[in-house]
Amino acid sequence: MREKPKYLPPTLREKHRYIAFQLIGERPFRKDEVKKAIWEASLSTLGVLGSAKAKPWFIRFDEKSQTGIVRVDRKHVEELRFALTLVTEINGSKAIFRTLGVSGTIKRLKRKFLAEFGWR
């Protein structure tokens, strides 16, 4: 009989934070453009090692309201926020990231920061 694999207890798991952002630009941007811009901003500002430690992960983007969610390691929230503020253009069009807020859960992030943009 096979044994069940052992799981990490919650105290040893890596903790994440979720950043809600709004993208303000000359034109509406697509999901793939935003995803690429976030990754490039992380790499150019934090470097390869810093990006590996921060573990930025694109969660969701609403093209209608131009708002989205990014997951990051809890120790590197401010570093990723800084990296996003340095973005000035995406594919040749002027754009800036506006951080709406940070939360420990997606549910709370949607309720507190993204509800006014129609997120449920």
Curated annotation (Swiss-Prot):
It is found in: Cytoplasm. One of its GO terms (molecular function) is ribonuclease P activity. GO terms for biological process: tRNA 5'-leader removal. The keyword Disulfide bond does not apply. It catalyses: Endonucleolytic cleavage of RNA, removing 5'-extranucleotides from tRNA precursor. Keywords: Cytoplasm, Endonuclease, Hydrolase, Nuclease, tRNA processing. GO terms for cellular component: cytoplasm; ribonuclease P complex. InterPro entries: Pop5/Rpp14/Rnp2-like, Rnp2-like_sf, Rnp2_archaea. The keyword Cytoplasm applies. Disulfide bonds: none annotated. It comes from the Archaea. Its EC number is 3.1.26.5. PANTHER family: RIBONUCLEASE P PROTEIN SUBUNIT P14, RIBONUCLEASE P_MRP PROTEIN SUBUNIT POP5. Belongs to the eukaryotic/archaeal RNase P protein component 2 family. Part of ribonuclease P, a protein complex that generates mature tRNA molecules by cleaving their 5'-ends. Consists of a catalytic RNA component and at least 4-5 protein subunits. This is Ribonuclease P protein component 2. It comes from Thermococcus gammatolerans (strain DSM 15229 / JCM 11827 / EJ3).
